[in-house]
Amino acid sequence: MKRLPVIPTIVVGLAIAIMVALGVWQLQRKAEKEKMIAQYAANITRPEIAFPSDPIDDALLFRKAVGRCRAPLSWRQRSGRDAAGGTGWRQIAQCRSGAAGPGMIVQLGLSPQPGGKPAWNGGTVRGYISHAPDDQPLILSLIGMARPKTLMLVAETPVGGLAANPVPDLSSVPNNHLAYAVQWFLFAGIAGIIYTIAVRRRMASPPPPAPPSS
């Protein structure tokens, strides 16, 4: 009878253990996200605060805030929806907010077409706190290696003829951790089944014939 392949079995076992651990971690993240969403719902009704100088605290999402953009340094556009549900291009400014610090990101409204920039030179902005656009790969979130997302201020009053930004919407906060957990558990189960079938076939196959004696 053939022996169980030791090294491949250890490698596959470790891979399965890692996938199961990631699934359990996603279930823990699901409970944490549910608590955060409840906090975001409360944030909508809380008093206005100054936009944070260190804009990476997710506990402030959906909180009313005010900040001063001394000057827009650069602009970028991202697709999105306006307050009426129409599609457009979000006009997002990277602002200088003071002598030091990371500055402030402000979404000033939506334009019907990409390109160009609003005729706006800065000023006081009131609105609510949201996440700035983020281009990190999804896989980093799945394995818990994503960097903290930067916050931005979504203006309540559009400028320069732009369409109004949407109001705070809790449905925009994804809580996909259960789906991610199921995926990891499925990956672990499939890997275990495939390896078990491969090992059984290997061990059940007849041994090669002995070489003829001379």
Residue ranges and their predicted role:
Residues 1-214:
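Surface-exposed, charge/polar-rich loops and edge strands
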